[in-house]
């Protein structure tokens, strides 16, 4: 009996130890990612394009041409290029034309004949671009060269209606998209590595991640292929032959690399009140007291009616009432937390709104209780 008891006790101890070890490994395990999600090759990038054009065929929802002279001027110039001359001083009061800006992104290695998606945005006072057709619009790059030509029927995701001063609108009506609405006419200069040397640029600067990238490349491709220049750029020696280089870079992009643990950071959005923090954020024990101050202003119109036949005038005078309330905040303890769940639990215990929580986090950072970098966007 004693031997059987000791045997079962030993098995239970080994099982418990295995569970603890497995849990420890799971807690410290960082998920590996493909290198293409962590870095990009310098020189392989998209290029923005922009153009100015006209949208026609709108159902009385276009620009009010008397208030947008650039629309009238653009329409006159376009008609003159088509051989149509308008009388001098003629004011065109049109409602089915709108001046727009057209934007697109030219991807790397795009060749003439490739098609691009474009976004069309109203720049005047058009009510809606629904049902409109974009006329041929050249799209230029930062160097002023035309790289694509855009034209086509737009798709507007919003909807709206108005009558007798009432208006209902869903989503944005002044912006539309045209799938495959532009055709590439000029290719960007091809990417040529200098002496077979490529620079791999990390999306986030981190010396630890850069070192791991170098180790992964050299382990897979051979020693001396990669070397880190700093915490963001890794230099890679690629084959001289273009065909061999493509396969070489494809293998590098699909290497699995475990990134280093990110620095603790808290992002505060002052416009929306949003707060985002990563898993590395920790807090120390601290005491927090925060009181809210609210000011409410109510304005009521008061009508002053003069006596009959007095010759006075009826006057509407606004009367304002101002109420100021301050809520006292008791001193509360925020316990130290080494995990994100513990940090969230401790901050939620304060019962503060997101706007108040931003101020509290700034004060905690100044007091040294918040172990994270604050970034306000």
Curated annotation (Swiss-Prot):
Listed GO biological process terms: bacterial-type flagellum-dependent cell motility
Compartment(s) of residence: Periplasm; Bacterial flagellum basal body
Keyword field: Bacterial flagellum, Periplasm, Signal
GO cellular component: bacterial-type flagellum basal body, distal rod, P ring; outer membrane-bounded periplasmic space
Single annotated GO MF: structural molecule activity
Function text: Assembles around the rod to form the L-ring and probably protects the motor/basal body from shearing forces during rotation.
Family: Belongs to the FlgI family.
UniProt name for this protein: Flagellar P-ring protein
Organism annotation: Cupriavidus pinatubonensis (strain JMP 134 / LMG 1197)
């Amino acid at each position: 009996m004693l031997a059987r008891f000791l045997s079962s006790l030993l098995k239970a101890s080994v099982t418990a130890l295995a569970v603890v070890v497995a849990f420890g490994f799971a807690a410290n395990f960082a998920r590996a990612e493909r290198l293409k999600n962590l870095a990009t090759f310098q020189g392989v990038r998209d290029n923005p394009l922009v153009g100015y054009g006209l949208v026609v065929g709108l159902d009385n929802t276009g620009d009010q041409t008397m208030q947008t002279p650039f629309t009238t001027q653009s329409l006159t110039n376009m008609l003159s290029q088509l051989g149509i001359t308008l009388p001098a001083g003629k004011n065109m009061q049109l409602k089915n034309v709108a001046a727009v800006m057209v934007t697109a992104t030219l991807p790397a290695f795009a060749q003439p004949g490739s098609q691009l998606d474009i976004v069309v945005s109203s720049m005047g006072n058009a009510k809606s671009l629904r049902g409109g057709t974009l006329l041929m619009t050249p799209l230029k790059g930062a160097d002023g060269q035309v790289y694509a030509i855009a034209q086509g029927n737009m798709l507007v995701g919003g909807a709206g209606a108005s009558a007798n001063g009432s208006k209902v609108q869903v989503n944005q009506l002044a912006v539309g998209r045209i799938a495959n609405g532009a055709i590439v006419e000029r290719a960007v200069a091809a990417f040529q590595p200098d002496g077979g040397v490529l620079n791999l640029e990390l999306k986030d600067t981190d010396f630890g991640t850069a070192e791991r990238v170098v180790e992964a490349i050299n382990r897979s491709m051979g020693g001396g292929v990669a070397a880190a220049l700093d915490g963001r750029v890794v230099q890679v020696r690629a084959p001289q032959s273009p065909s061999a280089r493509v396969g070489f870079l494809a293998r590098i992009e699909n290497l699995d690399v475990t990134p280093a643990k990110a620095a603790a950071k808290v992002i505060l959005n002052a416009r929306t009140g949003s707060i985002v923090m990563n898993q590395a954020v920790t807090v120390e024990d601290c005491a927090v007291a925060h009181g809210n101050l609210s000011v409410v202003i109510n304005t009521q119109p008061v009508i002053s009616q003069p006596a009959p036949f007095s010759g006075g005038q009826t006057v509407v005078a606004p009367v304002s009432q101002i109420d100021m309330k301050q809520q006292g905040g008791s001193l509360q303890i925020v316990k130290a937390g080494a995990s994100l769940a513990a940090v969230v639990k401790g901050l939620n215990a304060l019962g503060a709104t997101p706007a108040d929580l931003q101020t509290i986090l700034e004060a905690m950072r100044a007091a040294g209780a918040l172990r994270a970098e604050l970034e306000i966007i």
